[in-house]
């Protein structure tokens, strides 16, 4: 490919992803943590104000930092928040991951809880981002990391949004939640990797884990939510026909558990939302809903 053609392709890609060639682009950085050079991508929209919110996005097992959740950059352009895509460390299988206590992660020394907290503090200080309005989302293995953070650091993030995430059995049995946290989960009922009804016998090899509704009810109870509202999202119409039936739009049922304890002193009541994607697969479910828009809609409720 000649240099002119290469430049043309790069410009077209930038226009497609960011909307115009003058838009900001994610940048690659490293961060030293426990003798490891950890990588991350950082997106700072043009015109970002001081004390802007920060959203951290975690990839799935074996993934790359920006493999999922890229559309949050488009939301960030409009809403003016920073987006960080950290990279998981490599495990014994040579796969990038978040250390959440899968059976095959036994002996893995990586402390991702500490890494994410220290990386967030670094970004807040370096770029003048909000310490209060920092949020966490992630898909699959990244979703499991979100749940682990909810147990161990509920006061660090203003709200948490696991996507196709699980609560491993050991988390439920061995950890005592240190408080409530606004939480939303998006999960397909036909997910073949992270089963909606759980895997108590560990047939999938990820370790035993509980059913998604039970996992979510943990945080409903922690928040002492007093009532549930159930709505169906409008069916999404794809502009381009899908070539895979698995990616056809699905009905999404939103369960909102409300009336919880104050999210902070004199703050709004804590809420927990569950997006039940009927027949949905193991994905960000963006073929069925505007997932990144919904994530920000939830996070925005907890800005203070």
Indicate where each model-derived feature is located.
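Bacterial N-terminal signal peptides that target proteins for export
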Residues: 1-9
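A domain-start/cap signature at the N-terminus of enzymes
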Residues: 19-54, 67-70, 75-78, 82, ...
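Active-site glycine-rich loops that stabilize anionic/oxyanionic intermediates
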Residues: 59-63, 280
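Cap/lid segment of the alpha/beta-hydrolase catalytic domain
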Residues: 87-111
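Conserved acidic catalytic loop of the alpha/beta-hydrolase fold
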Residues: 114-132
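Short beta-strand/loop motif that positions the catalytic acidic residue
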Residues: 185-187
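Accessory cap/linker subdomain of secreted extracellular hydrolases
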Residues: 189-236
């Amino acid at each position: 490919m000649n240099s002119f053609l290469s430049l043309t392709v790069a410009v077209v890609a930038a226009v497609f992803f960011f909307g115009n060639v003058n838009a900001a682009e994610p940048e690659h950085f490293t961060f030293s943590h426990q003798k490891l050079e950890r990588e991350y991508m950082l997106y700072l929209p043009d015109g970002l104000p001081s004390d802007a919110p920060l959203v951290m996005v975690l990839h799935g097992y074996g993934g790359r930092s920006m493999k999922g959740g890229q559309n949050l950059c488009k939301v960030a352009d409009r809403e003016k928040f920073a987006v960080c895509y950290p990279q998981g460390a490599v495990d014994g299988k040579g796969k990038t991951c978040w250390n959440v206590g899968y059976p095959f992660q036994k002996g893995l020394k990586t402390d991702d809880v500490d890494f994410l907290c220290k990386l967030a503090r670094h970004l807040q200080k370096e770029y003048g981002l909000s310490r209060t309005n920092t949020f966490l989302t992630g898909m699959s293995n990244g979703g499991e990391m979100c749940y682990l953070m909810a147990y161990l650091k509920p006061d660090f993030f203003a709200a948490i949004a696991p996507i196709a995430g699980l609560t491993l059995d050991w988390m439920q049995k061995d950890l005592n939640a240190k408080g409530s946290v606004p939480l939303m989960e998006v999960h397909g009922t036909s997910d073949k990797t992270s089963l909606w009804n759980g895997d108590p016998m560990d047939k999938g090899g990820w370790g035993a884990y509980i059913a998604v509704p039970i996992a979510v009810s943990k945080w409903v109870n922690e928040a002492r939510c007093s009532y549930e509202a159930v709505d169906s999202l409008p069916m999404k119409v794809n502009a381009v026909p899908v070539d895979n039936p698995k990616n056809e739009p699905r009905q999404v049922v939103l369960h909102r558990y409300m009336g919880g304890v104050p999210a902070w002193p004199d703050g709004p009541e804590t809420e927990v939302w569950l997006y039940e994607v009927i027949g949905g697969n193991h994905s960000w479910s963006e073929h069925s809903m505007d997932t990144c828009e919904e994530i920000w809609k939830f996070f925005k409720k907890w800005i203070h």
